[in-house]
Amino acid sequence: MTLICIAVVLFCFYLGMTAILYFTQRSKMYFPETVHTTPAQAGLSEAEEVTLTASDGERLVAWHVAPRGAKPVILYFHGNGGALRYRVERFRTLIRDGVGLVGVEYRGYGGNEGSPTEAGLFADAEAAYAFAAARYPAPQIVVWGESLGTAVAVALAADKPVGRVILEAPFTSAAAVASRRYWYLPLRLLMKDQFRSDERIGNITAPVLILHGLQDHTVPYAMGERMFELTKAPNKHIVRFLDGDHEDLDSRGALHAVGRFLAGDLDRAPHP
């Protein structure tokens, strides 16, 4: 009888913990910085701030820098705890080379109203794409996703014509990442926002570049490798950073790899 009582208590505890995590899951997935920062305040005076409207009416802050001539335009999607202002140095380096930028703050981020969800972020990405596509031809648009933003980038590039795709620390699915911590929960059944990039990336036909650190403690390198395997684009590349973690790839040569990719140099190199 004692063992039965213990089992019942443990089962009830498990159910309670599962319920708590289910109802609070989005607060554990999204960490929005809610402060609105203009490009000038962030130190990127070259950029203009524009307002986009998503299909559901949400208004979104975005940064825009026109490219020099036919140079690429980066359509940039940051991670779940990111903000455009954290990538100013990266943007500045790209802009110096004449590359353009359309960077969007998701709903709930950067002073925007609303709350982030998978469907919401996808709608935000489509609004950013519509802005870019109205000004630049599809082959000039390069989609760059970082961490959670890779799922947004994959979904967009799988559905819209783009010139190139850059995925920095991509993951196969949100459940796969979360299961490393919550291994004891049926996350594929519980998670509202699945972000199944593994099911979408095969639909991308544009050239793909994957950047991933072998020491990444947030999204294991094995997931980046798996995403590379699932990519059916005939022109695909993966650049591995031996000592790279999750957010330090710029200091390890990521922008150099991106520059070569944008210039088409990697297209002429043998695949790994």
Label every model-predicted segment:
Residues 225-247:
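Catalytic histidine neighborhood in serine/cysteine hydrolases
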Residues 203-205, 210-216:
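Short beta-strand/loop motif that positions the catalytic acidic residue
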